[in-house]
């Protein structure tokens, strides 16, 4: 079992020598990252961090950076429910791609605190399943569960985007890709981040 907290070298601009920074510093700054497909493992990690950080200080907001191609519905819904449950507001920031379950988590951020980077992409669609692997009886049960999940996701999109049910239902029939400004117009994000044109040299 390792002793101590793992550290990584980091060189501050303008400094000659690198300093050793512990890898959990970003978490202490309340910065969380979803940079992969949603599965049970990353879901449990993010849920644990959100609960721990909210118990530590329920007044400081959390920031969830999303760059995800999507993933499993149930672990994603668990993250969404936790975001609604914890007392701190959860800012969601889309960088790169927030597709499928990634866009669901993006829209789940505190309303007025959902941001997309200027070149980010967002994609929504209905949940999918591997019907071809199931036997007939299982197929029917799985189809019923899939319809319930689709209804849940649709209801959340309607509530959090302000779009009518028919618009969201129609959009979820197929893959709908959006730019950051289109996602803002659609109500998935509240703001598009402004590019920093400052000179860092």
UniProtKB/Swiss-Prot annotation:
Protein's GO biological process: protein quality control for misfolded or incompletely synthesized proteins
Top EC class, one word: hydrolase
EC number, as in UniProt: 3.4.21.92
Gene: clpP
A UniProt-annotated Pfam family: CLP_protease
Record field: catalytic activity: Hydrolysis of proteins to small peptides in the presence of ATP and magnesium. alpha-casein is the usual test substrate. In the absence of ATP, only oligopeptides shorter than five residues are hydrolyzed (such as succinyl-Leu-Tyr-|-NHMec, and Leu-Tyr-Leu-|-Tyr-Trp, in which cleavage of the -Tyr-|-Leu- and -Tyr-|-Trp bonds also occurs)
Protein family per UniProt: Belongs to the peptidase S14 family.
Gene Ontology terms for molecular function: ATP-dependent peptidase activity; ATPase binding; serine-type endopeptidase activity
Keyword Protease on entry: yes
Task performed by this protein: Cleaves peptides in various proteins in a process that requires ATP hydrolysis. Has a chymotrypsin-like activity. Plays a major role in the degradation of misfolded proteins.
Record's keyword annotation contains Plastid: yes
Cellular compartments annotated: Plastid, Chloroplast stroma
Active site per database record: 100 (nucleophile), 125
SUPFAM superfamilies in the record: ClpP/crotonase
Record InterPro entries: ClpP, ClpP/crotonase-like_dom_sf, ClpP/TepA, ClpP_His_AS, ClpP_Ser_AS
Subunit structure: Component of the chloroplastic Clp protease core complex.
Organism: Ranunculus macranthus (Large buttercup)
GO CC annotation, single: chloroplast stroma
Swiss-Prot/TrEMBL keywords: Chloroplast, Hydrolase, Plastid, Protease, Serine protease
PANTHER family the UniProt entry points to: ATP-DEPENDENT CLP PROTEASE PROTEOLYTIC SUBUNIT, CHLOROPLASTIC ATP-DEPENDENT CLP PROTEASE PROTEOLYTIC SUBUNIT 1
Name of the protein: ATP-dependent Clp protease proteolytic subunit
